[in-house]
Design a protein with these regions (language model features):
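Conserved, mostly hydrophobic/aromatic
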Residues: 41, 77, 118, 244, ...
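Catalytic alpha/beta active-site cores
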Residues: 1-233, 251-254, 258-265, 301-306
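Short, acidic/polar
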Residues: 27-36, 282-290, 407
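Short beta-alpha connecting loops at secondary-structure transitions
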Residues: 65-70, 95, 134-144, 177-181, ...
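Glycine-rich anion/phosphate-binding loop at the beta-strand->alpha-helix junction
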Residues: 192-195, 222-225, 230-315, 319-323
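Mobile "lid/hinge" segments at catalytic clefts and subdomain interfaces of large enzymes
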Residues: 131-134, 149-206, 283-364, 370
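A glycine-rich phosphate-binding loop feature that marks nucleotide/adenosyl-phosphate handling sites
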Residues: 51-52, 101, 127-133, 171-179, ...
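Flexible, glycine-rich loop/tail regions that form catalytic "lids" or insertion modules at the edges
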Residues: 1, 316-317, 321-328, 332-473
């Protein structure tokens, strides 16, 4: 281990895409934040939508009250999408959209905006998260039952494969599973079971020619978590890489090695960020980032880091800049990208990877025996396993068996100048919500009601007939 020759600097590995997860208040305010972050060296966008947008409610719906713009940007129509990407050329951008239950419609708005900018759809690069299965297990922003949700996911995949070949139509999310308490084995197995369920649905639909199925597989990406158990996380990512290669080759017959690559982006663990002594979170975030970048054979291709104070509230631009600079320092000031895989040949790493793979395969067999991931969700099995794991995690912290610095050990502290300021986090004003509602009312008043009715009827027909819902969206 570590005895590989130094790589020629001309053969440096390319840095991953630098992102920050951002969006709040209004589309215009979020656009200003995006352009500011891009000017600081960020190389991709990661859009956070507010809860009404994630669950299909317009900003003026009674259930949206108090949530508009609070944890993300509100988008109700193409006008909001225009404001969100004002002066940002979509043909030159790599955009990740954290959207699931309403992914088809948010992607449709993005494509419509690209059409307005005369950007060929084939040139668009980015990702729709579009993993509705994990919504039943962790986040809860689902709209439809599991089976119809799987149909929506399938439609987006089939549409982008033909129209947007550089787009990742789905980010299979193990990230949220870990946030909900998943063990590394559960994170591996549950995420891979979701990917299998989706690919099986695409193949069974009869809407994808066999010779095109490899293209579908090749565009599936993953959104992975990385916690502080450093060695285990490195091994988990290597296990993901090896298991995905096996599944795509053996189950789906994909012969192109490039299409079998485990392509993933990452946000490091937010669950472990603490309100107590939040300055310690800087060290946590940096260590977790190392777990997804050190191992070249399983290195993330896109990274977004939470800000140190996200346990307290929405981060300020300065806080997001701090996280961005951590990525840039690692990529450009260290020699990390000049070497091959520094863990290759390590018996410790190999043994742990083998252990994780074997346990994940056993869990995958169990899920398959239940009828697959949808059945495992409907039965409550997957949710029950996550709840049990999370209870064990919390109990270990409360008993002091799992040490969390500043929480259950080393709790004496000085006052922090970082959190003493009155505006140490961003707050969303009530005026942001009222202004959004006023703009939405004006938009509705100006549109052609006949065109609206015709568009909704076309979408309704597609939904009922089984046709792909993306074109009429």
């Amino acid at each position: 281990m570590g005895d590989q020759p130094r790589r020629d600097k001309s053969l440096r590995d390319k840095p991953w895409i630098f992102r920050t997860y951002a969006g709040h208040s209004t589309a215009a305010a979020s656009n200003e934040l995006y352009r500011k972050n891009l000017s600081k060296g960020q190389t991709g966008l990661s859009v956070a939508f507010d809860l009404p947008t994630q669950t299909g409610y317009d900003s003026d719906h009674p259930l949206a009250k108090g949530e508009v713009g609070k944890v993300g940007v509100p988008v109700s129509h193409i006008g909001d999408m225009r404001a969100l990407f004002e002066a940002i050329p979509l043909g030159e951008m790599n955009t990740s959209m954290t959207i699931n239950a309403t992914a088809a419609w948010l992607l449709a708005l993005y494509v419509a905006l690209a059409d307005e900018q005369d950007v060929p759809r084939a040139k668009l690069q980015g990702t729709t998260q579009n993993d509705i299965i994990k919504e039943y297990l962790s986040r809860g922003t689902y709209v439809f039952p599991p089976a119809p949700s799987m149909r929506l996911t399938k439609d987006v995949i089939l549409f982008t494969t033909k129209e947007m070949p550089k787009w990742n139509p789905m980010n299979v999310c193990s990230y949220h599973l870990q946030e909900a308490g998943a063990t590394p084995v559960q994170e591996l197995a549950f995420a891979l079971a979701t990917a299998i369920g989706v690919l099986d649905a695409v193949r069974a639909s009869g809407q994808c020619a066999p010779e095109e199925f490899g293209d579908v597989v090749g565009r599936i990406s993953f959104f992975v978590n990385a916690g502080l158990r450093f060695v285990t996380e490195i091994c988990k990512l290597r296990a993901f890489t090896e298991l995905w290669d096996e599944i795509t080759r053996e189950r789906y017959g994909v012969t192109d090695a490039k299409q079998r690559l485990f392509r993933y982006g990452v946000q490091v663990n937010s669950l472990g960020l603490t309100e107590q002594q939040p300055e310690n979170n800087v060290a946590r975030i940096l260590l977790e980032m190392l777990a997804v970048t050190l191992s070249k054979d399983a290195r993330a291709r896109a990274v977004q880091l939470p800000a140190w104070n996200e346990a307290l509230g929405l981060p300020r631009p300065f806080d997001q800049q701090w996280s961005l600079r951590m990525q840039q320092i690692l990529a450009y000031e260290t020699d990390l990208l000049e070497y091959g895989d520094v863990f290759a040949g390590s018996p410790v790493i190999a043994a742990k990877v083998a252990e994780l793979k074997a346990a994940a395969k056993d869990e995958l067999k169990h899920i398959e025996a239940m009828g697959g991931t949808v059945k495992a969700v409907e039965s409550g099995y997957l949710k029950q396993r996550l709840v049990e794991s999370n209870c064990r995690r919390i109990e270990a912290i409360e008993r002091g068996e799992q040490i969390v610095v500043g929480v259950n050990r080393f709790t004496e502290t000085e006052a922090s100048p970082l959190t003493d300021a009155a505006e140490s986090v961003v707050t969303v004003s009530a005026e942001a919500e009222s202004g959004q509602i006023e703009r939405l009312a004006a938009w509705r008043a100006a549109r052609d009601p006949k065109a609206v009715a015709a568009a909704l009827e076309a979408l309704r027909r597609a939904a009922k007939s089984g046709a792909n819902i993306m074109p009429p969206s």
